[in-house]
């Protein structure tokens, strides 16, 4: 398996006010999977996504990516691993306002010895005619495409997306999700999306439902599931 999460636990607060955010989380993904972490606010999905990305330190358990146990890495090694293997897309685009589209995307290539062909990538993103524009000149969907390009330019093994369409309208959201599907198929990038949106599960081949910090349901072959399996 490409990604293995085993017996993962995470809590916040002191002993007296301890809140268990993730409890005994276990699952695995093969390379090229498109997985949704589905759950309401407070279910632990964003914390789990951040733990996989090395942004949250876990209390116990292990996270293994491509045979690297990232939960045991020192901070410097973890930072290097994150830069080399992982890409991040967030709800807010975090583009550099004084850089153009092409310059914002190039920022992601500076830390990789063999970045993706930027012209080809920008065309795949549908941004070629906007490549010399600044973020303030772009729509929300175009800004998110630019953020996706910045994450992809370094050829990440895993793309971690935290509510990537929550700030977008319905049509733009569908366009972004369609783009992520194309990226998954074309580049065989493993994609994990944390979301509360049931619609996004339609694009995934693995659905992991979280509720109160535990995996409530893990559906591994979405194409053959019964509709009732998507219910809580």
Q: Predicted regions: what is each one?
A:
Residues 70-87, 224-229:
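ABC ATPase NBD coupling module
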Residues 134-144:
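Conserved ABC ATPase signature
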Residues 159-162:
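Catalytic Walker B motif of ABC-type/P-loop ATPase nucleotide-binding domains
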Residues 53:
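Helix-to-loop junction immediately C-terminal to a conserved catalytic motif
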Residues 153-157:
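A short, proline-enriched helix->beta-strand linker immediately N-terminal to the Walker B motif
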Residues 61-69:
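Conserved ABC transporter NBD signature motif
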């Amino acid at each position: 398996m490409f990604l293995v999460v085993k017996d993962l636990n995470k809590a916040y607060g002191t002993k007296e006010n301890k809140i268990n955010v993730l409890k005994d989380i276990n699952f695995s993904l093969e390379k090229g999977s498109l997985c949704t972490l589905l759950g309401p606010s407070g279910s632990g999905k964003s914390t789990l996504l951040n733990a996989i990305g090395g942004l949250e330190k876990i209390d116990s358990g292990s996270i293994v990516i491509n045979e690297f146990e990232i939960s045991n890495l020192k901070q410097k090694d973890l930072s290097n691993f994150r830069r080399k293997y992982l890409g991040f897309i967030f709800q807010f685009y975090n583009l550099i306002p004084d850089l153009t589209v092409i310059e914002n995307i190039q920022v992601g290539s500076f830390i990789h010895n063999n970045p993706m062909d930027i012209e080809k990538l920008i065309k795949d993103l549908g941004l070629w005619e906007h490549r010399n524009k600044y973020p303030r000149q772009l729509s929300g969907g175009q800004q998110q495409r630019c953020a996706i390009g910045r994450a992809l330019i370094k050829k990440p093994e895993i793309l971690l997306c935290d509510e990537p369409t929550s700030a977008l309208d319905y049509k733009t959201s569908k366009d972004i999700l369609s783009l992520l599907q194309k990226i998954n198929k074309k580049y065989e990038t493993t994609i994990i999306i944390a979301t509360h949106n049931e619609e996004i599960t339609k694009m995934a081949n693995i659905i992991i439902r979280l509720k109160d910090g535990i995996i409530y349901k893990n559906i591994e072959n979405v194409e053959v599931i019964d509709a009732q399996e998507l219910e809580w």
